[in-house]
C-alpha cells in the first residue's frame, strides 16, 4: 500500500521532501514544543482536530519505536548489527517522525493554509536556479504578513448589523468554559 500521511491535509510526502533534512528540529525539541503548546489538548479524551489526532499518533509511534530500539540494543549481541539498526532508526524513521511532528505542530500554530503556502513557496524557491532566486529562503513565521490569500469567485461579504438590544435588557451570561478542553 502506498499511504501518504499528509494527503488528507492537502500536502504530500513529495511536498515535504523539498525541505532539507537539517531543516527539521530534533525530535526532542519538537516533542517539547508540542508539550508546551498543546499538552492539554493532546492529553484530553475529547477529539480536538485531525492535526491533534495525527500529532498524538506520531508521538505514540515514536515512543514505540524507542521501545523497540531499546529492546534491540539490549538483545542484539553483534555490535555492528546493533549499530546498523540504531542508525537506520535515527536516520530514516527519525526524519519521517520529525517531518510529521513539524507539519502538524506548524499547522496548529500557523494554520494549515499558511503551512501549505509555505511548502509551495519553498518548493518553488529551492527549484529555482540560484542565479534567479532571492538569496534567502521563505520563512514560515513571516509568511502570513506577506501572503494575501483570496477566495475565488466571491467579493467580500458584508455583514448586516445585529439588532440592537434595549438598554434595559441584560445580556445572557456565558457558562464557564473552565471544564472544556482548549483545542
UniProtKB/Swiss-Prot annotation:
The keyword Cell membrane does not apply. Residues 155-176 are annotated as: 3 X 7 AA repeats of S-P-R-R-R-[PR]-S. Disulfide bonds: none annotated. GO terms for cellular component: host cell; host cell cytoplasm; T=4 icosahedral viral capsid. Phosphorylated by host SRPK1, SRPK2, and maybe protein kinase C or GAPDH. Phosphorylation is critical for pregenomic RNA packaging. Protein kinase C phosphorylation is stimulated by HBx protein and may play a role in transport of the viral genome to the nucleus at the late step during the viral replication cycle. Its main location: virion. The modification Phosphoserine is found at residues 155, 162, 170. It holds the Pfam family Hepatitis_core. Sequence repeats lie at residues 155-160, 162-168, 170-176. Residues 149-176 have a biased composition (Basic residues). GO terms for molecular function: DNA binding; RNA binding; structural molecule activity. InterPro entries: Hepatitis_core, Viral_capsid_core_dom_sf_HBV. Residues 177-183 are annotated as: RNA binding. A motif (Bipartite nuclear localization signal) lies at residues 158-175. SUPFAM superfamilies: Hepatitis B viral capsid (hbcag) (SSF47852). Belongs to the orthohepadnavirus core antigen family. HAMAP family: HBV_HBEAG. Homodimerizes, then multimerizes. Interacts with cytosol exposed regions of viral L glycoprotein present in the reticulum-to-Golgi compartment. Interacts with human FLNB. Phosphorylated form interacts with host importin alpha; this interaction depends on the exposure of the NLS, which itself depends upon genome maturation and/or phosphorylation of the capsid protein. Interacts with host NUP153. Self assembles to form an icosahedral capsid. Most capsids appear to be large particles with an icosahedral symmetry of T=4 and consist of 240 copies of capsid protein, though a fraction forms smaller T=3 particles consisting of 180 capsid proteins. Entering capsids are transported along microtubules to the nucleus. Phosphorylation of the capsid is thought to induce exposure of nuclear localization signal in the C-terminal portion of the capsid protein that allows binding to the nuclear pore complex via the importin (karyopherin-) alpha and beta. This is Capsid protein. It comes from Hepatitis B virus genotype C subtype adr (isolate Korea/Kim/1989). The lineage of its organism: Viruses, Riboviria, Pararnavirae, Artverviricota, Revtraviricetes. The gene is C.
Amino acid at each position: 500500500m502506498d499511504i501518504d500521511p499528509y494527503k488528507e491535509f492537502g500536502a504530500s510526502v513529495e511536498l515535504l521532501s523539498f525541505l532539507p533534512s537539517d531543516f527539521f528540529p530534533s525530535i526532542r525539541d519538537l516533542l517539547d514544543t508540542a508539550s508546551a503548546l498543546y499538552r492539554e489538548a493532546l492529553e484530553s479524551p475529547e477529539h480536538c482536530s485531525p492535526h491533534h489526532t495525527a500529532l498524538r499518533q506520531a508521538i505514540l509511534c515514536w515512543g514505540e519505536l524507542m521501545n523497540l530500539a531499546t529492546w534491540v540494543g539490549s538483545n542484539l549481541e553483534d555490535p555492528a548489527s546493533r549499530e546498523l539498526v540504531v542508525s537506520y532508526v535515527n536516520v530514516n524513521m527519525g526524519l519521517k517522525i520529525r517531518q510529521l511532528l513539524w507539519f502538524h505542530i506548524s499547522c496548529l500554530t500557523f494554520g494549515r493554509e499558511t503551512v501549505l503556502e509555505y511548502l509551495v513557496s519553498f518548493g518553488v524557491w529551492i527549484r529555482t536556479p540560484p542565479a534567479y532566486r532571492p538569496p534567502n529562503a521563505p520563512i514560515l513565521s513571516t509568511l502570513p504578513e506577506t501572503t494575501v490569500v483570496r477566495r475565488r469567485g466571491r467579493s467580500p461579504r458584508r455583514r448586516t448589523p445585529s439588532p440592537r438590544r434595549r438598554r434595559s435588557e441584560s445580556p445572557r451570561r456565558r457558562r464557564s468554559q473552565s471544564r472544556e478542553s482548549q483545542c
